Structures are given as C-alpha cells and as structure tokens.
Amino acid sequence: MSKARRGAGPLAVALAMTVTITANPAMAASAAEINRSVDAALASLHASVPETRQLANRAKAVLVFPNILKAGFLFGAQYGEGALRVRGKTAGYYNTAAASYGLQAGVQAFGYALFFMSDSARDYLSKSGGFELGTGPSIVVLDSGTAKAFTTTTTQDDIYAVFFDQKGLMAGLGLQGSKISRMEK
C-alpha cells in the first residue's frame, strides 16, 4: 500500500470530524440548556478559583463557554456555545469555533470564561457581533495560580480568559484563531 493511501484514511477521518464538529446543527443547544450549563460552569469555576468571583463582579460582562469540544488528527476543529452575562443576566448567546492544521491528535473538552473589564471591550463584542481572538481587544490568559495572586486593583487589561474543566488527550490549549460569533436563540 502506498504512503499516499495510508495517509488518506486518517486524513478523511480528521476532515469528517472537523466538518461534524463545526457544522452539526444537532449540536446546537437551546437557550435554556445554555443558561443551565453557564450557571453550573460559573459555580464550578468560582468554587475551584474563588478569585474569579471577584473578577466577575468587577467585569462589565462575562462570556462563558461551558463545554467546548476540540478534536483533531492533522486537521482539527473545536466548537462550543455559551452566553454573555451582564450583571448576572444573559445578554446574548455566542458560539466559538476554530479550525487548525498541524501535528496534533486527540480529543479534548474544556470551557473558558472571558471577563470583559472595560466598556470598550464589551462594546466591541456587541457591535461587531463577535470577533476573532487575537484581533481586537487585548486578552490575558490566567491560570489558577495567576488568578490566586490577582486582585481587583491589578486588573488593567481589556479581557481576562480563564480555562476550566479540561478533560481529554490533546496537548496544548490556545485561543489563537478562535472565532466568536453571536447566535440567535
């Protein structure tokens, strides 16, 4: 069997996974399901990293993606749905999607929350209907150790991102290339 044929099988599987993850309407959750998932995710995040509660209280808005599925083998994709919370109330629904190519293999599920600390960052999200991470307002990724040393007087950036509930077999985690788009629910 030629090298081209041997490589075609995994490539076809990866392409099928990419299309399924990013384009499957059956994956779309209802507004009520998203709200329940966001409530549970925030409670879990605040319990595991208590400093995020203070960060959320100071934020102009918090965009929470409770469950993002990422899969890949050479080609990869990720998709998740979430809600924007302003003063504790849902102000809109968004999805996040990304595609990638490179040396990668595995499946991972995770969530993340974006804390919008300035009016301009929140307005950028709502006026643009979404944005591609890496363009627009600056984003600082906090891990649980950094968050513990964090105080409300040290928040000087537009957006802080905190990852949570990471499960799976994929190494590395990044926001580069992720596109966030507004959804109608």
Language-model segments: residues:
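Small-residue-enriched, tightly packed secondary-structure blocks
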Residues: 28-185
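Bacterial N-terminal signal peptides that target proteins for export
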Residues: 2-13
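Bacterial N-terminal signal peptides
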Residues: 12-22
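Sec/Tat signal peptide C-region and signal peptidase I cleavage site
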Residues: 22-28
